[in-house]
């Protein structure tokens, strides 16, 4: 497990964040949400955009409650993965 600070530094260099390790450490109460939905495209299921959006918004809104400014989006060029920036 890396720290949220280390994840933010990596995200600055790579333009994407190590989402699972960073957010689970900062917000353990949403660990199950992340584990269930972080790799939505890897199970071969065809998720609709609105399905992606509700998880992005759920994570974003939870982070905002803790005072983070958050941008969350899915990148669908290399499969579906969630990138969250703060």
Language model regions located:
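Acidic, low-complexity, intrinsically disordered interaction modules
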Residues: 37-74
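C-terminal edge-of-domain segments
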Residues: 69-86
């Amino acid at each position: 497990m890396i720290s949220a600070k280390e994840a933010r530094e990596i995200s600055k260099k790579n333009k994407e964040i190590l989402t699972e390790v960073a957010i689970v450490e900062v917000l353990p109460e949403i660990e199950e949400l992340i584990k269930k939905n972080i790799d939505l495209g890897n199970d071969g299921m065809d998720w609709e955009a609105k399905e992606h959006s509700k998880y992005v918004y759920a994570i974003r809104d939870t982070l905002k409650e803790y005072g983070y400014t958050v941008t969350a989006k899915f990148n669908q060029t290399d499969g579906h993965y969630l990138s969250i920036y703060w």
